[in-house]
UniProtKB/Swiss-Prot annotation:
Pathway: One-carbon metabolism; methylamine degradation; formaldehyde from methylamine: step 1/1. It is found in: Periplasm. Its cofactor is tryptophan tryptophylquinone residue. Keywords: Disulfide bond, Electron transport, Oxidoreductase, Periplasm, Signal, Transport, TTQ. The gene is mauA. There is a cross-link at W112-W163 (Tryptophan tryptophylquinone (Trp-Trp)). This is Methylamine dehydrogenase light chain. The modification Tryptophylquinone is found at W112. Heterotetramer of two light and two heavy chains.
Length: 186
């Protein structure tokens, strides 16, 4: 048998000292906690509001940010002021209205919010977009406006999520979106 070198004997002493002071179960428990904690770290919420002015969202949809000029005359148009951050079919074109779902659909209990400028009175209003669920997608008046949209890690400000979860009677199928005013934002 070869004689241990200084490095080997140092590691052996450290291992024996650690083994005499800690039990195997304690070590395995701490190791397991560390591994689980490391795996769950990316799931923690991230708030990046301080860097919002650096965000450059991709311009997509019917109207780009540069060309978006809200109007207050035609609620069935994608540039109607209440639709500044809508992503989906307007219920106005599907048998409903700005604030009510078409017959045969149910209002989702969840919503996403945006603040939209009304050119008619010069005020900014808080809009709580809510999906109407329970029928197949309407497919008329599809608008994809991204003004004020934030990434999915801020879901209450993201319009890419189908908000039909939580609807009664398992009505999880998206049909259209309503745009009720919650109050003044300014």
């Amino acid at each position: 048998m070869k004689k241990n070198t200084g490095f080997d004997s140092g590691i052996e002493k450290l291992a024996r000292k650690t083994a005499s002071k800690t039990g195997r179960r304690s070590f395995i428990g701490k190791l397991g906690g560390f591994l689980v904690g490391s795996a769950l770290l990316p799931l923690l919420p991230v708030d990046r509001r301080g860097r919002m002015n650096e965000a450059h969202a991709e311009t997509k949809g019917v109207l780009g940010r540069e060309g978006y000029k809200p109007q207050d005359k035609d609620p069935k148009s994608c540039d109607y002021w209440r639709h500044c951050s809508i992503d989906g079919n307007l219920c106005d074109c599907c048998g409903g209205s700005l604030t009510s779902c078409p017959p045969g659909t149910e209002l989702s209990p969840s919503s996403w919010v945006a603040s939209c400028f009304n050119p008619g009175d010069g005020q900014t209003y808080l809009i709580a977009y809510r999906d109407c669920c329970g029928k197949q997608t309407c497919g008329r008046c599809n608008c994809v406006n991204v003004q004020g949209e934030l990434p999915v890690y801020r879901p209450e400000f993201n319009n890419d999520i189908v908000w039909c979860f939580g609807a009664d009677n398992d009505a999880m199928t998206y049909h259209c979106t309503v745009s009720p005013i919650v109050g003044k934002a300014s």
